[in-house]
Each structure stands twice: as C-alpha cells, then as structure tokens.
C-alpha cells in the first residue's frame, strides 16, 4: 500500500482537533435530534412479547409484563395456539421506542443519554452509536466495574481511595467506565465518585464517561423514558422509596444502554451483551491506529456474590486483568485472603470458613455443590496471578486505586506470550495513551529494559501529537535523540499534518490550496500535498521577508511521498513546491524544528521543551516572540482569546531571551554583544538584535547589555567614556584628536591588551623559571609579536572621528539649525521677486536634503529588498513629515517662480507653512536625548488621543453651531459667513470668546448687514418693526449654557483625563520606549554619510559614481551584522547553551524558594501525613480485630481439647469414643490470608488444563473438581460428571468406560470427549533444532501456532501405539521431508514420553506423547526444505516459525520441560 495513503490528512486533523476541544460542526439541535432519531430507528431494536400466557398470576404473562402492555396480536395469537411459552420463540424485535436525553433534575441539572436496546443488538452498532451519534471519543482504556448490586458498607478510607483513584485513572487515560447503571451497590459508589469530580472541577471539559448497562425490565419509572420519536429530554425522578424489587437509574452516569430481552423483573439479562461489548472494544486498535495495540480492558471488583465470581472467572479466561479491593466485603475479601496462599493450600475447608466469615447470613444459602464450584473457580483464578491484582490499604504503599489498575494492565501485558521488546513497546504505548508518566517511570523505564533512541520514536511522536509534554520530557531523559527523531523529512511533515486546530493550521491549509480558501472555511474533501516548503513560506511570512527560508531544498526536498492534506478540489492535485533556490548557509537544527512546531500551535509546555533543545536559544526565543505577535495580529479578528494567549506566550519568550542574555552579559559582556549581532543560520540568517526590533521586544532592547552595544555603535571608534563637551570641542578644533584629548576604542583595546600581556608574561616567567634569560626573552618576544595591536595613525583617527554616528549627529544638528535659520531669514527678510544668493543657497541646501531622503529610501540596510524597505519608509512618521515638507517646498517654489503677484504670494504662504513642518521635524532629532526623547514620545501619543477627542468635540460644535445659525440668521447664502457662524464661532466660544448676537440687550444693528449686502459684515437676524431681533432670547442662552456645559467642562476634562492616562502609561515605560526608538536614530546616522548638508552632496555624488559606473556599492557595516567563523560559532553557541542551563537552573531554584511553592509543598506534606496517620489507625484496628478473632477461635478449640481429656479420664483408661479435636497449625492460620509473602507451588498442579470447566468446542461444562479431589484415591462422593462424546460411540456404557481410568485423576467429565478412542491417545512431537548463528550461541526450534489456544507449540501429530516411527513422521512432515530425516532419526533422542495435560482429556480418554529431538545443520538440503515449508505456511491458519529455545517459548509444561532438556543437551542457556 502506498505510504502516503496511510498518512493522516489535514482535514482529519482539523476534525479530531476540534473534537478534542469539544467543538463540533455547528448544526441546529433539531437537526441533530432528527438525525439521531432516524439512525436509532434504523439500527436499534427493542424486544416485546408476542404470545400472552398467564404464569399463574392473574393478568401477568410469562414474560412478566401485565396483559394491558401486550398488543392485540399477542393476546389473540393465531400462530402460537397450543404452544408452551418460550422466550426464544415468543419474543420478537421491533424498532426501539425509548431513546434521547435523560434529565435527572435536582442540583446541577444532571443530564445524560439513554437508549433501549435489544439483548441481541450488534455490538458494532452500539459502538457506532456511542462514538458517532453520541460523539464519545474512542477510549484509551475500558474499566469494567463489577461487584455487589446491593448497598454494602465500605470503610471510609477505602471508599475515598477507590473514588479518587477511579476518577484519576479515567481522567488521565481517557477511559470509559462500564457499570450496571443502577443506583445501588458498586454502581452507586461509581456515580458518587463522578459527582464529586464534577462538583470539584466545575466545568464540563474532560467529562468522565460512565456508561451504565442495565436491564430494561427492572428499571423503575421506565415509562417516562418511552416515546416513539425520542425524548429530548426525558425527566426521570429517583424514587428509592417506591421502587420495590425494581431499581432506579443512577443519576450520576452519563450514558445508559438499557438491555431489553422482552421480559420484566429479571436481573442479569444484560450480562451477555455487556460481555460481548467489552470483547469488541478490547479488539479495537488503540487510538484508531494500525499499531497492533488494542484497547486494554480491566475489571475492578468490589464486594460481590456468585454472579461476580462468574464475571471475574470468565474475564480472566479472556485474558482480562482484574483488580480486587480488599476490605470491600464478601467475594472481594475471600479472593484477597487467598491471593497470597499457595493453590495447594486453598481447600474446600478453607473456602468454607471464608464464606462463613465474610458472607455471614448469606452463608446458609450455599450448597455443597456451590462450595465445590467456588473452590474450583478460585483455584483457577489463583493460577493466573499475572491477571490478578489485590489492592490492600494496609500495605505500606501510598498509592491509590488508579496505580493498581494501571499496574495490573502492565503486569498482564508483561506475561503475554509475545514478551520481550514488543511487550515493552506495547506497555510504553499504553502509558503514552494514558498519559501516566509515573507509571512509565516505575514500571517501564527500569534497569530491566534497555531502550535505544529509535525504539522510542513512535512513543515520542504519539506524545508530541497527543500534547503530553511530561511524557516528551521523560522520553528525552531516557535517550530520545531529537536529531535522529527528526532525521527523516516525513516525520516533521507528519507533525505539521497532526497540528491541533489553530490559526497557523488554517493559514497552512490556505497556502497549500493556493490561497483560494475564504476566512473561516474549513478544508473540504480532496487532497493536495504538504511539504516543508509550505511551512517555510508561511514561517518566513511571519518572521519577515528579511529572513531566508528555514528549510533549504537540499535538506528538505519535497517528494511524491509528502503528507497529504485535504483541500476543496475534485481530485488529488500535486502542489509544486517553490522553485526558489534557498541559501546553502541555512543549517538544519532539529531542536529549532521541534520548537517552531510547538510555537506555531501556541503550545507553551511543548514549546518550552523544544526551546531547551535549541542550539541558538536567544535567537529562538526572539523569533518565537516575532512569530507569535504576528499570528496574534492576524488572528485577532477571528479569535481574540487565542490572540491573547499568543501575546502572553510572546511576552514569556521575550523574558526568556532577557534572562539568558542577562546571564551571558554578567559573565562576559563582549561575547554577549557578539551574540546580538552574529548572523544566525538557524533563523534565516537574521540576528538577535534585528529579530528583537522586528518583534517590538522593547524590554529586550532596553536591556543594559543591548543599550551598551547601541551606545558603542553610536560612538563608533570613539570611546563611550568621552564627555560630550570634548567631542564638541574637537568638532570645532579637530587637531585636538591627535593630542590624546579624545580617547578612541583602539586606545582602550591596546591598554587592556597590555595589561593581559603583562599578566601572561608574569605567568610565563614563573613557568620558565630557572632557564636562561635569552630563552625567556625569545618566548616573550614571540608572544608579543603574535598579539600586538597597533595604534591608529593620524588619517585613521580623523576618518574614525568623522564617521562616528555621534559626530555625524552633532554636525547634522548644526546643519539643520543653519538650514532653519537661513529659511527664516529668507521668509522674513530676503524674499524678493528675483531669488537672492541666500535663497539660492536655501535651494541647494534643500536639494541635499532631497538627495539624502532618496538615499535612505534605496539604502537596503538589512537586505530585505526595496519593496519592504519602501513600506517601512512610508510607515515612519518622521519620513512622512520629510516627504510632506519637501513636496510643500517644491509646490511653494513653483508658485514663487511665477510672474503673477497673487501666485507669488501664495507660494510664500506655502513656504511659511512648510517652515512649520521643518520645525516639527526637530523633534525627531532630539529623540536621542534621554531627557527630551521620552517627552517627544508622550507628545506623539497625545496627538493621537487629540484626534479622537476632536471627533467627539466636532459633534457638539457642529450641532450647536448649525442650530444657532438657523435660529438667528435666515437664509444666509455666503459660504464664508455660514462656516464662520456654524463652526468657527462655536469653536472659539469654548476658549472664552462668548458671542454677543444671542442676547437682545447687546444687539447693535450697525454691526450687521440687514440684506447681507456688506461682505464684511454678518447678516442681521430676523427683525421686528422696531428693529429688534425676534428670536427667543431664552432659548439661545439656554443652548449656549448646555453647549458650554458639555463642550467646555465635560469634553475638555475628558481630554485632560485622556492626556493624564497617556502620560502615566508612557511615563511608566518611558525609559523602555525611548531605548527602543533610539535604535532607529542610531541606525540612520550609522549609515549616513559623514558630511552634513549641504556638503553631503559630495558624498552622494561619490555614491552615485560608485554605484552606477563602478558597480561598487559599499558593504553593510559589521557593527549590526557579523559572520563568524565556524569554530568561533560553535564555541559561542556552546557557551550560550551553558549560560541557558545556568539561567534555567536559577529560575527553577527561585521557583522552589517562592512562598507559593513552599505553601503548596507544606500542604502536600500535611495531607500525606494526615493520610498516613489515618491509614495507620485503620491498620491497627484491623490487626487487632484479626488477633481477637484468632484468640477466640483458639480458646474455643482449647475448650474442645479439655473436654476430650475429661471424657478420656472418665473412661478409666479406655479409648474415648470422641476423637480429639485437631488444633490449627500455623499453616492453617496462614490459610486465612494473613500471609504477607507471595508463595508458589513447589510442583505443577495435576492436569490443570484437563479440569477447565468449559469443555473445548462444545457447550458441555465439566463437574468442578477442586485440586484436593483430583486423585482417585480421595473420596469425592458428590462427584457426578456428565458423559460426553463428540462423535457417536457405542462405548458410552458404564462397563466400557470403567475399563479406562485417567492416570492423572478426575477431570469432571466422562466419555471420549473430543478424542478418538478411550484410553491413551498417542501424539508424536518431532523437534527440529538449529543454531541461529555460526557462534552457536542461540538454539532455535521449529514451532507451530495453535490458533485455538493462542500459543506456540511443538510440531506434532497423532500416532497409533504400535505404528512405526517413520510412518508417523511421513504423515506429519510429508514423504519428501521424511526421506531426508531418516539419517537424523539415528542420531535423534527421545526427551519425553508420557501423560499430557490436555484440555480434551476426560476421565476415560487422555493424551500421551513422545517427543524426539532432531538437530539440523544450517547448510543441509533438509534445512532448505524446512525453511521453504516455514515461508509457505505464513498465509495459513497454522504458521510455522523458528523460535528461540527458552523458558517462555511454550506454555505447556511438558513441552517446556522437553525444551529444557534439549537446551541442557546442547549446553546452551534456557
């Protein structure tokens, strides 16, 4: 099968991930109910009686239902007249009429789902109902809880442990709990455990699934559940008082399967269906994967009676492990007391005493035959110790029931026939599925198991995909190598295909299908392939185009086997990968791949583990911050909650980067600064500094170590310790730089090197002490020549001084002030019709500024490309001001050069406004100042707030202005006066310029124009006959008061509050914000030419000539990007990793010393101490009760002995007719289960397989034969075995059977059974052996698989007593092989001959065998034929296989003994 076909698709991942979060496709509830009802009616049936026959009670049928509940056909049947009532014939199936949601009411409004099902319902349909219709996730474990169906007492401590452990194992493993479903006995305890968990958790997420399988005919108030179309919901009331012999459903179960066999009042009708359902689930693959690991099933037993014993017995025969809780009562205590006793000591007398002790009043109902059967079944149970686990609270083990359950499953798994590496891998996969790290640490990763990294890869993949970070960490601690795990490209592709539902997954799906998917649209059926080029393109989009793709074509080249994703297309289309040739400098870092996979899904714990595996940890943390902030920005509209979580995780990794960098900076500042500017091949050849700037990690940039680097870059080759006044003085009189007045960094390096050289010289002198002075001088001279630094010459000092960004900045400040001074002079003094020399100089100056802006636009500082550079340029506010000022200047210049006086004046006005913008540009220059810079940031923030305030204010201004203008003035047509009256006057009113035209007392007709004829006067308001205004004076004054109340008081105070909030917000972080924005200015002046405007034109001319004609553009400076040699790179990263480990260790230590951690630790210790004292008290009480019971029994026996002595004395020396009582020995005391040690039988039990209760391939049950009654010499009067012959036989009469008696003893059945003849039935086993290797270290034998017994066995066949050996071998092996084995027969040796414990044996027929060993050489023709026979048998139901001769190779005792003798004969290990 094509590998790609097995790989999961993205749409499946989306569906599963959504299901994990409890989200399903949004369908209306009515549609879901209709769909459920339709499916149930089609697939689920109920049973009803179709033949009414009274059972002796009036109006009651044999089925238990009253006559009124029978249909007319059942009351008057025509087909069954005269027949006896038979449940199998007179009960029919019809569509069920009881299903839906069940509501129990009360506190919390508990609800569940229920359905009435026929007892013959297909288990496949039931499982489909639960998983597809009820939307239950497939279980990772099935816990079948069985025991007492009636209420019973259980100790408080044991009850708490059971409830806590059951919920814990179900919660952590994702298990289903299966019970009887009624509100009584053990089912009630399970329900109470679920209730306690629900109340404590307070949420429906991670709901425990508890499925009750109850008989429909015994449910009280079941009529409320019946409706042909289903009830949504059905209101069910718990009525324990009126239930009588019936039972109520438990209100704390989540789902109910109500099994209907057509009868009423009969318990146990659900047992068969429940067993079939458990068997079906146990055969399903764990996690719906084809890994060969099936869903494990465990049986938990509390209390219990005869029905529970049958359940345990049958479960263990089906290889289901059982956990018995000692102290829960009755059957559970009986089994617990004999669990540590040898089977040979478990007698009928012991079982009789235990039943009397634990069943008390119920013991009277036990018959002798029942005690015999109980003894036999308990003996068989004890013979399967790998499937039996007893949980005792009085043992010195402080763990709950959950650990006992999981340990029982692992113990059963270890005893599997396929033990070995496969067994360990299965156990590990189970532990991963259960998410139980504690079990894996204690039971799997032990000294017995040796794991390689490749062995743990499947578990690692499951843990990563299943979001189990603790398991991932455990696997890494136990040898998983991330490099080996991610070595194959397909592994990483599969990880991305298994991403849970997240924003990145939707973006990736959109990219795979070419961007045609709309927002919110889920991928639809159809398939395209995903390869790491898709991931690389998406990650590059998130990181920024300044980075290179993370996955190069040579490392991860997409192939035809790439993982498939579902996209909406009609067929399978191959999406070609990007054809871009990626840089070969990009390296493969598996830790980075794992970290990146966890980050994009916003998984904090897995990302933390991946980050710890990264080589370049600071760059990784900063890159994660950038990716997460970008994802949060893009997903904000879709999922604000997810965006918030992403921002929190981004802040976390910014803190991690700060922490590691602080650790590095405290140890070595120079190496730490080198980490900031080194090019990181793992992260797209970016730098830590640039990643932090792109991610807007202000706190990281504000770190003292980063600021020290920026200050160093700012000063250039000058020392950072130079005072500003020295720099300014040298700018005025530059020859001072040659006098030592100004310190250069080279001078400081020389001084430091001289100090180090002096120290090393002293060390070398001490090393070469005693040698000649000439030799010491030669060593010192050679050392000095290797490490000597030369001081800067005069020209280098001058160029270094001029190229310093700090000096450039000061020159540009002076130049800009000169420009503004010249601009102001021209505008105010020298703005003539013909341009003067000052104005011409201004134009030249502006030209230099324009050229510099063009250079900045095209200067690709980080190599990200012109498009990105242009976008960044436009986004900068200061660049916008620069462009605006230049455009306005050009516009003003064009108008100024016109001949028209009007246009000339307009040009001057434009230039004056432009001067304002140039002055505002000064704020950017002074942002470098530590004092003014933060204030400029505050002003910028307040300007943004002012825009929002003006929007609110404009509403009131326009509202009041239009209303006032309309009231006062009639039909004003002059636009300028309309705007003045409706906008301007209301606006200036806010600042205290109150209008006079709204008050009649201040009205002056001379101040206005009546007909609006005077353009310089406003129009008069409407006048009456005496030339006074007619508007209502009270209204305009009231409007003014209300307007001033809202505009002048409310809104202005709101503006003050907004400004105050902005000031406080920025002021708290003003230093951080200033340090972050300081970088932009440093970067600008670092790349700026040395000459200030207007002399900068010379620099621009040189750059133009070099770029256009010489094609020799200057390289980007190494102060911001530095490529390290490979050796230096490895050393630096190793040092960084060491610093990271120090930081993480200190962080963990700080957390452990925190107050919260100490309080939590103290609370845990107090709880453990309280539990220990409580358990100790219960242990003392239980021990005391046992001692008192034993003392009472011994006193009673002593009294009997004394009575016998008295009777003997009375007889005057004659023997007393009364036998002396037998005193109990220590061994009998131990029979009561007080033995603490686990004992085993010294010898094998007599034919154990021949006494199995169920005879193979039949419905016949043997008579139970306890071990003590096996021997024919022992009297067993109740023994009445059935007679069974699979084939008709005339030898079934008693006389013929008595002629043959099984030498092994009683078997519980008479006749031939499935054997051919009475008496011995002979079988011959030829054992072919060979050496696996040339060193003769491993001996192998030819084995055959017995499908019925599910085990490997020896090759063999039937033989007649007097039949020649060659003839038997010919029938077993064939004629060809038989001819080639004749020579081996001479050297063959008979290693065993005698009785065989076979499950087909009876009292009168049994199996005897003869085993012969035949050793083959590896290069003989016979060996070739045998190997061919093995290969050809693989497809048959009885395959052959060469297996190692070992103690676990065969299960049968006689075959195991034969293999032991063969191993001893060949001197090899067994």
Swiss-Prot record:
Chain sites annotated for binding Ca(2+): 853, 856, 879, 1084
Residues exposed to the Extracellular side: 830-836, 898-905, 969-977, 1003-1034
Family statement drawn from the similarity comment of this UniProt entry: Belongs to the transient receptor (TC 1.A.4) family. LTrpC subfamily. TRPM2 sub-subfamily.
Binding annotation for ADP-D-ribose 2: 1398, 1400
Protein name per the record: Transient receptor potential cation channel subfamily M member 2
Pfam families named in the record: Ion_trans (PF00520), LSDAT_euk (PF18139), TRPM2 (PF25508)
Disulfide bridge map: 1008-1020
Locus of motif Selectivity filter: 991-993
């Amino acid at each position: 099968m094509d590998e790609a076909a097995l790989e999961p698709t993205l749409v499946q991942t989306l569906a599963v991930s959504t299901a994990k979060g409890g989200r399903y496709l949004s369908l209306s509830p009515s549609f879901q109910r209709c769909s459920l009802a339709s499916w149930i009616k089609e697939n689920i049936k109920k049973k009803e009686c179709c033949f009414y026959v009274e059972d002796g009670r009036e109006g009651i049928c044999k089925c238990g239902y009253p006559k009124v509940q029978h249909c007319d056909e059942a009351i008057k049947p025509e087909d069954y007249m005269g027949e006896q009532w038979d449940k199998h014939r007179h009960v029919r199936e019809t569509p069920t009429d009881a299903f839906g949601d069940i509501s129990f009411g009360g506190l919390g409004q508990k609800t569940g789902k229920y359905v009435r099902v026929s007892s013959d319902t297909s288990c496949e349909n039931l499982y489909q109902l639960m998983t597809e219709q009820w939307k239950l996730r497939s279980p990772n474990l099935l816990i079948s809880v069985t025991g007492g169906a009636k209420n019973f007492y259980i100790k408080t401590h044991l009850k708490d442990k059971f409830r806590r452990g059951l919920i814990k194992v179900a919660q952590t493993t994702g298990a289903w709990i299966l019970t009887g479903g009624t509100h009584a006995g053990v089912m009630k305890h399970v329900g109470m455990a679920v209730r306690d968990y629900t109340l404590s958790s307070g949420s429906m997420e991670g709901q425990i699934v508890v499925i009750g399988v109850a008989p429909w005919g015994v449910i009280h108030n079941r009529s409320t559940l019946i409706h042909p179309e289903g009830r949504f919901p059905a209101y069910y009331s718990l009525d324990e008082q009126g239930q009588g012999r019936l039972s109520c459903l438990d209100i704390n179960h989540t789902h109910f399967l109500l099994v209907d066999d057509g009868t009423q009042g009969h318990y146990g009708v659900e047992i068969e269906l429940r067993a079939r359902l458990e068997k079906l689930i146990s055969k399903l693959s764990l996690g719906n994967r084809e890994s060969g690991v099936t869903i494990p099933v465990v049986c938990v037993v509390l209390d219990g009676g005869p029905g529970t014993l049958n359940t345990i017995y049958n479960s263990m025969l089906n290889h289901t492990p059982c956990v018995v809780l000692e102290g829960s009562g009755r059957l559970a205590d009986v089994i617990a007391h004999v669990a540590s006793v040898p089977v040979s000591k478990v007698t009928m007398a012991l079982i009789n005493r235990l039943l009397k002790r634990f069943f008390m009043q119920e013991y009277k109902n036990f018959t002798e035959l029942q005690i015999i059967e109980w003894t036999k079944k308990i003996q068989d149970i004890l013979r399967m110790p790998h499937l039996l686990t007893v949980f005792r609270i009085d043992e010195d083990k402080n763990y709950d029931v959950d650990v006992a359950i999981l340990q029982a499953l692992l113990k059963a798994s270890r005893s599997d026939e396929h033990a070995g590496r496969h067994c360990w891998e299965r156990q590990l996969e189970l532990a991963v599925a259960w998410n139980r790290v504690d079990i894996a640490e204690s039971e799997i990763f032990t000294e017995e198991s040796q794991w390689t990294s490749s062995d743990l890869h499947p578990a690692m993949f499951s843990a990563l995909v299943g979001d189990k970070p603790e398991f991932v960490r455990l696997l890494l601690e136990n040898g998983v190598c991330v490099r080996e795990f991610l070595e194959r490209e397909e592994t990483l592709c599969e990880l991305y295909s298994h991403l849970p539902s997240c924003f990145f997954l939707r973006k990736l799906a959109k990219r795979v299908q070419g961007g045609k998917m709309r927002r919110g649209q889920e991928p639809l059926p159809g398939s395209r392939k995903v390869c790491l080029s898709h991931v690389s393109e998406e990650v590059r989009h998130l990181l920024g185009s300044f980075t290179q793709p993370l996955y190069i074509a040579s490392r991860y080249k997409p192939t035809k086997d790439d993982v498939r994703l579902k996209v909406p297309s009609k067929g399978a289309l191959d999406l070609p990968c990007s054809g871009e040739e990626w840089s070969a400098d990009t390296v493969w870092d598996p830790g980075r791949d794992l970290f990146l996979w966890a980050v994009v899904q916003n998984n904090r714990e897995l990302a933390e583990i991946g980050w710890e595996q990264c080589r370049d940890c600071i760059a990784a943390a900063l890159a994660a911050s950038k990716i997460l902030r970008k994802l949060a920005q893009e997903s904000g509209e879709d999922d604000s909650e997810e965006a918030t979580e992403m921002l929190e995780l981004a802040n976390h990794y910014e803190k991690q980067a700060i922490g590691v960098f602080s650790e590095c900076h405290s140890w070595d500042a120079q190496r730490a600064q080198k980490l900031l500017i080194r090019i990181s091949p793992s992260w797209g050849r970016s730098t830590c500094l640039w990643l932090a700037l792109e991610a807007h990690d202000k706190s990281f940039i504000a770190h003292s170590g980063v600021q020290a680097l920026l200050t160093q870059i700012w000063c250039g080759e000058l020392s950072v310790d130079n005072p500003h006044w020295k720099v300014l003085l040298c700018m005025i009189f530059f020859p001072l730089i040659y006098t030592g007045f100004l310190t250069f960094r080279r001078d400081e390096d020389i001084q430091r090197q001289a100090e180090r050289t002096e120290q090393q010289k002293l060390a070398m002198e001490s090393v070469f002490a005693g040698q000649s002075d000439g030799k010491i001088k030669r060593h010192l001279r050679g050392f000095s020549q290797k490490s000597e630094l030369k001081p800067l010459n005069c020209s280098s000092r001058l160029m270094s001084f001029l190229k310093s960004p700090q000096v450039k900045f000061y020159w540009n400040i002076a130049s800009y002030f000169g420009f503004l001074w010249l601009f102001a002079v021209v505008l105010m003094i020298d703005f003539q019709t013909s341009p003067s020399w000052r104005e011409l100089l201004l134009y030249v100056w502006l030209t230099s500024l324009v050229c510099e802006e063009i250079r900045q636009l095209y200067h690709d500082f980080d190599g990200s490309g012109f498009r990105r550079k242009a976008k960044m340029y436009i986004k900068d506010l200061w660049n916008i001001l620069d462009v605006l000022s230049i455009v306005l200047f050009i516009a003003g210049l064009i108008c100024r050069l016109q001949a028209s006086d009007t246009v000339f004046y307009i040009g001057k006005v434009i230039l004056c406004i432009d001067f304002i913008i140039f002055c505002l540009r000064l704020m950017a220059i002074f942002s470098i100042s530590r004092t003014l810079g933060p204030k400029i940031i505050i002003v910028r923030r307040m300007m943004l707030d002012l825009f929002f305030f003006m929007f609110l204010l404009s509403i009131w201004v326009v509202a009041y202005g239009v209303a006032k203008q309309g009231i006062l003035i009639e039909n004003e047509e002059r636009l300028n006066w309309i705007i003045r009256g409706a906008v301007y006057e209301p606006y200036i009113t806010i600042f205290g310029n109150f209008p006079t035209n709204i008050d009649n007392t201040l009205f002056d007709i001379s101040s206005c124009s009546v007909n609006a004829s005077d353009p310089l006067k406003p129009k008069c308001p409407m006048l009456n006959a005496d030339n006074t205004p007619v508007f209502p004076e009270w209204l305009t004054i009231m409007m003014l008061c209300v307007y001033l109340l809202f505009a002048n008081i409310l809104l202005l105070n709101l503006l003050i509050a907004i400004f105050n909030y902005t000031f406080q917000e920025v002021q708290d972080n003003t230093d951080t914000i200033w340090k972050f924005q300081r970088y932009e200015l440093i970067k600008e002046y670092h790349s700026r030419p040395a000459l200030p405007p207007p002399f900068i034109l010379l620099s621009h001319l040189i750059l133009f000539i070099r770029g256009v004609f010489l094609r020799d553009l200057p390289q980007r400076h190494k102060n911001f990007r530095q490529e390290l040699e490979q050796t230096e790179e490895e050393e630096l990263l190793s040092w960084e990793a060491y610093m990271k480990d120090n930081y993480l260790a200190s962080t963990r230590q700080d957390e452990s010393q925190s107050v919260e951690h100490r309080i939590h630790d103290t609370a845990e210790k107090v709880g453990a101490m309280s539990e220990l004292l409580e358990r100790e008290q219960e242990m003392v009480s239980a021990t005391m009760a046992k001692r008192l019971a034993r003392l009472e029994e011994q006193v009673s026996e002593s009294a009997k002995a004394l009575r016998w002595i008295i009777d003997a004395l009375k007889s005057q020396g004659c023997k007393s007719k009364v036998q002396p009582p037998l005193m109990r020995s220590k061994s009998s005391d131990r029979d009561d289960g007080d033995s603490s040690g686990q004992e085993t039988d010294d010898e094998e039990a007599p034919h154990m397989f021949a006494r199995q209760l169920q005879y193979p391939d039949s419905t016949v049950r043997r008579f139970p034969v306890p071990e003590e009654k096996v021997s024919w010499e022992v009297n067993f009067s109740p023994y009445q075995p059935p007679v069974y012959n699979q084939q008709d036989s005339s030898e079934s009469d008693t006389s013929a059977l008595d002629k043959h008696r099984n030498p092994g003893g009683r078997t519980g059945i008479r006749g031939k059974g499935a054997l051919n003849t009475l008496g011995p039935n002979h079988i011959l086993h030829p054992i072919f052996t060979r050496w696996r290797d040339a060193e003769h270290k491993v001996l192998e034998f030819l084995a055959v698989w017995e499908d019925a017994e599910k085990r490997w066995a020896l090759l063999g066949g039937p033989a007649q007593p007097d039949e020649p050996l060659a003839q038997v071998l010919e029938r077993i092996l064939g004629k060809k092989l038989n001819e080639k084995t004749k020579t081996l027969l001479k050297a063959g040796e008979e290693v065993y001959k005698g009785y065989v414990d076979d499950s087909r044996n009876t009292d009168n027929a049994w199996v005897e065998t003869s085993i012969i060993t035949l050793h083959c050489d590896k290069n003989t023709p016979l060996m070739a034929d045998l190997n061919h026979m093995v290969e050809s048998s693989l497809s048959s139901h009885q395959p052959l296989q060469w297996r190692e001769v070992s103690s676990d190779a065969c299960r049968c005792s006689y075959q195991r003994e034969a293999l032991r003798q063969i191993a001893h004969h060949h001197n090899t290990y067994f």
